[in-house]
Amino acid sequence: MLILGIESSCDETGLALYDTERGLLAHALHSQIDMHAAYGGVVPELASRDHIRRTLPLTQHVLEQAGKSLADLDGIAYTQGPGLSGALLVGTSIAESLAFSLDLPTIGVHHLEGHLLAPLLEPDPPAFPFVALLVSGGHTQLMRVSAIGDYELLGDTLDDAAGEAFDKTAKLLGLSYPGGPAVSRLANQGQPGACQLPRPMLNSGDLNFSFSGLKTAVLTLVNQYGDALDETARANIAYEFQEAVTEVLTKKCMAALRNTGLNQLIVSGGVGANARLRERLNMAAKRRQYQVHYPRLEFCTDNGAMIAFAGAMRMQHAKQGNHSFTVRPRWDLAELNKP
């Protein structure tokens, strides 16, 4: 079964071809980071217009890359939500229109399920069940994953996501968009112990997170420095901030594995690309004889490959339904069912 995947939930246009027998055949991505950088964040209208320009050319590109044509497709998967309404509508409209013209089935994929399953695209993927850390600009969640569509929420952020805290800290430090990579690069120049920030809910006894207080603590620290906030001070704050976030995430992940009795952790989402987080998780897991699985770096952020894969996994068991142009900008992962 050959599935075309379309991702257009925010500021990346991702296309991919996944074959259930041969695996990932081709993928392509256009990022809008440069376009939105001048505004310090994503402008929804600009994002939608750019998806319109990019989706069909990228579709042709992945088909050529794989030596396939539209006639070879067995189905089309697209991101139905959550995300920006206009951006989702672009991908949905193109997917459903193509499918209607080719008489193909479609499946709307939950964006977060795509992220959750992205590590399964890698060689030697983990077997079910496992614990998943989904950590991005919009979500910070721990889940027990027993099968595709069988997700138990173990812990969630009570306020802001880790990725949002990275972006806010980047703005406070005068760094460029997107904030996560910029903070990480600056943190490499920081010195341990030069300043202190709290570790929110580190010892809360549950698996929930909170990062709003950490953002406030960074703001307070920046204001305390005032005119003395030079490059050295900024690097030290970035270092301490990254240490705080990664320490909390690592401890909660180890607790989730211990509480569930599982020994496999997968990490997905944009913050999952953070090198310091990977280092801490790998060290902590090695001490406890756990295994940690990550998607390749390019699949940590939004991409078409994860949508093609998730769609293929569900489409193998799904009945063909009526074509629908409905998008779900807000969509709880708990609402998903097994295929």
From Swiss-Prot:
The keyword Transferase applies. Keywords: Acyltransferase, Cytoplasm, Iron, Metal-binding, Transferase, tRNA processing. InterPro entries: ATPase_NBD, Gcp-like_dom, KAE1/TsaD, TsaD. Its cofactor is Fe(2+). It is an enzyme of class 2 (transferase). It catalyses: L-threonylcarbamoyladenylate + adenosine(37) in tRNA = N(6)-L-threonylcarbamoyladenosine(37) in tRNA + AMP + H(+). Pfam families: TsaD (PF00814). GO terms for biological process: tRNA threonylcarbamoyladenosine modification. The keyword Transferase applies. Fe cation binds at residues 111, 115, 302. Binds 1 Fe(2+) ion per subunit. One of its GO terms (cellular component) is cytoplasm. GO terms for molecular function: iron ion binding; N(6)-L-threonylcarbamoyladenine synthase activity. Substrate binds at residues 134-138, 167, 180, 274. It is found in: Cytoplasm. Its EC number is 2.3.1.234. NCBIfam families: gcp_kae1 (TIGR00329), T6A_TsaD_YgjD (TIGR03723). Belongs to the KAE1 / TsaD family. Required for the formation of a threonylcarbamoyl group on adenosine at position 37 (t(6)A37) in tRNAs that read codons beginning with adenine. Is involved in the transfer of the threonylcarbamoyl moiety of threonylcarbamoyl-AMP (TC-AMP) to the N6 group of A37, together with TsaE and TsaB. TsaD likely plays a direct catalytic role in this reaction. This is tRNA N6-adenosine threonylcarbamoyltransferase. It comes from Methylobacillus flagellatus (strain ATCC 51484 / DSM 6875 / VKM B-1610 / KT). The lineage of its organism: Bacteria, Pseudomonadati, Pseudomonadota, Betaproteobacteria, Nitrosomonadales.
